[in-house]
Amino acid sequence: MTEDKAEKVMPEETAFEEIEKDFQEVLSELSGDKSLEKFRTEYEKLHSIMKKSYENEKRLMAKCRELNAEIVVNSAKVATALKLSQDDQTTIASLKKEIEKAWKMVDSAYDKEQKAKETILALKEEIVNLTKLVEQGSGLSMDQDSNIRDLLKFKEEVTKERDQLLSEVVKLRENLAQTIEKQQAAEHAKEEAEMAISQFQQEIQHRQNEASRESRKKEKLEKELRQIQTDMDGRQAEIKAMQQYMHKSKEELQRLEQQLKEQKILNERAAKEVEQFQMRNAKLQQENDQHTLTCEQLSQENQQKALELKAKEDEIHQMRLDLGKLNKIREQIHKKLHQLDDQKAEVEQQKDTLKNQILGLEREVESSKKQAELDKKAMEELLRERDILNKNMLKAVSATQKQVDLVKLHEQAKKNLEEEIQNYKDEAQKQRKIIFQLEKERDRYINEASDLTQRVLANMEDIKVREIQIFDYRKKIAESETKLKQQQNLYEAVRSDRNLYSKNLVEAQDEITEMKRKLKIMTHQVDQLKEEISAKEAALVKLHLEQQRIEKEKETLKAELQKLRQQALETKHFIEKQEVEERKLLRIIAEADGERVRQKKELDQVISERDILGSQLVRRNDELALLYEKIKIQQSVLNKGETQYNQRVEDMRILKLEIKKLRREKGILARSVANVEELRQELYHMQREFLKERTRCRALEEELENPMNVHRWRKLEASDPSTFELIQKIHTLQKRLISKTEEVVEKELLLQEKEKLYVELKHILARQPGPEAAEQLQIYRHTLREKTKQLKVLSSELNMYESQSQEYKYEIERLGNELMSLKKKYLAQKRKELVLKNKDRMSMNNIFSETKKSVPRFTGGGFPLHQATKVKF
């Protein structure tokens, strides 16, 4: 692995050195030219930034390697923790099942106990009533004696049932205590495992965050480096373009200089020709004194020609100066144009980037606005629904709070546990994925290590050293089975050994390279070494596999030992909790025994009082017989009134519930229902009925409190309801009860739906953007305003530069046109001069020929040849 890293680092360093060389070459090229001084400084800045980014990249790579090593260590710890958490979850599930069974048994026992208590209370009330009657003074009838005996028997049976139920409750409580202790022990173990997992997760998260930060820094630096390289490439391209332009301008200057030289040569030739003409004129003047007039004319013409030549030379000189000025102006214009082009390109780039940024920001702003509007609408709708739901929830909860509290608690605990289990499953799935990736990396690294070992096997001495180290390793593994506490130190030792092995591998590679150089000398030893190496390689592979197997066994033993320790701790906590629960149960049993003794005393007291009352009742039997009949009649009347009163109270309660229901339905359906008036009328009728029932109840209460029967001594007549009426009433009550149970089920379903809606509302509200999003939006708006201002400034500058460039273009075109017109004038002048020269030559030739013809020629004795000799005879 280290060799691969070294091989990766080497080409990067070589590439960096090549870039450094290129930079130095470019600097040496740019240092001679002063016009590119700014570019050279920019280039140096880019190079310094690239150097810094390269150094930061090196540092980040080293940090990434360290973080990867720590992640591997933490992943192993997480794997062990996940195994423990999975075992804990199975135990928790089994304990939950046992607890649910125990709770069911406890609930049934509690119901039985409540029924028994109710019967005891009813009996006590009857006893109190009887004692009151006895105190009023009269004897009991036979029916009453039989009733009392039946009641006493029933009480004894009830007490027996209560004792049985108490014993069952004690047993169930013991079972419950055991299961609770088991559950608490499992929960304690689960909490410890969760703590360990959370610690490992925090460490892994911390490491991952650091790695992600470093990777982001690295990516940022790589982007900057790429940007710098692209800038450098662009600057180099600009330099090349400038050099090409300079080369072209030099060629243009050389061409113009060549033209000037040719022009000079032509002027010199013309001057020489003028001198020749002057010489000829002088000779002609010397030879032709007779033709002075013609010579004077010719001299005048020559003087005129000389003046014209001087004027032409002055014009040529002026044209040369103008050309020099024009060249300078052209160079300045070219420089300005290049500067403007560069500035324009930079401005266009900035403009494009700013446009892209503005477009991106506008899109983000639009999307955020749309999202904000949608969120606002959703929030308003959800707030409305939440208000409605809150109202409904408050109304529903006020009606069924006592019955639902326990169910809610149990369901909440169940949901929390299920959510925790689901979270643990998700986290375990994530950790499994991470472990799977890490195992892949580990396998890759193992393959790389095996490849490296195969390379290293060429050296015999290193193999012997490794065999010794493997032997030591085995000893260490054997010791680790007895001393599992020192596993971490051994692990660190193995890591250091691995690092040593990697160093040894590097050294062995160096030695291999040296041995390769000596291969030409040691060819006869190579075959023997190859055979020995193959044997040693096979042995080393076996040893490597054996080592892997031993490491796996070591890890399993470590996990088992950790598991056993945790189980021991769990059992210890379980025993402690059992003892605490046992103490609680003993205290409860003692309280129950005290209650039983107290009730027994009360029963004995009641029996003694009964005996006393029996003796008193025998004496007062006659008086009580008369009173009993009256009491019976009054009691039946009272019972009827009480039943009617209870019915009215129940009707009132039902009506109240119905009113609440109607109000709730009215609140929910107020927007969609059109027949509001009908509902109001119904509500009004219901209220009237309710008021009627209330007045009726009040009248009944007043009648009970202030009976209208003045003559107490008269016998009251009454008739018990028939069995058919009672059966009908029972049927109606059963129907009512069924309907009420159905309503309760519907209410529970509604409550569940409302709870679901409430949870969804909570989640939606949690997902809604908070004040931070508004602050970010404000920041984005502020930045958008600044960017728009900058864009306006840049656009105005761009327009100014464009107008300047247009002016410069027009100036260049004008100068080019002037230059072309000057060239045309110059060529026309040259042509005129050539034509005049040709004419002068022709005229001179004609003059010479005419002078030669007109002058007399003498030959021999000096007689003229063209005159005829007149001879006289």
UniProtKB/Swiss-Prot annotation:
- What does the record say about the knockout? Male mice are infertile with severely decreased sperm motility and abnormal sperm flagellar morphology.
Compartments, as annotated in UniProt? Cell projection, Cilium; Cell projection, Cilium, Flagellum; Cytoplasm, Cytoskeleton, Microtubule organizing center, Centrosome
Which residue intervals make up region (Disordered)?
202-221
Q: Which domain of life is it from?
A: Eukaryota
Keywords from the named record: Cell projection, Cilium, Cilium biogenesis/degradation, Coiled coil, Cytoplasm, Cytoskeleton, Flagellum
Where is composition skewed (Basic and acidic residues) in this entry? Answer: 204-221
**Expressing tissues:** Predominantly expressed in the testis. Also found at lower levels in ciliated cells and tissues such as neural progenitor cells and oviducts.
Its main subcellular localisation, reduced to a broad class, is other
Which segments of the protein form a coiled coil according to its record?
A: 106-609, 642-832
The UniProt entry, under InterPro entries, shows:
CFAP58_CC (IPR049270)
Q: Name one GO biological process term.
A: sperm axoneme assembly
Q: Name one GO cellular component term.
A: sperm flagellum
Similarity annotation: Belongs to the CFAP58 family.
| Task performed by this protein | Has an essential role in the assembly and organization of the sperm flagellar axoneme. Required for the elongation of the primary cilium and sperm flagellar midpiece via modulation of the Notch signaling pathway.
Its assembly, as annotated, is: Interacts with ODFP2.
The molecule here is called Cilia- and flagella-associated protein 58
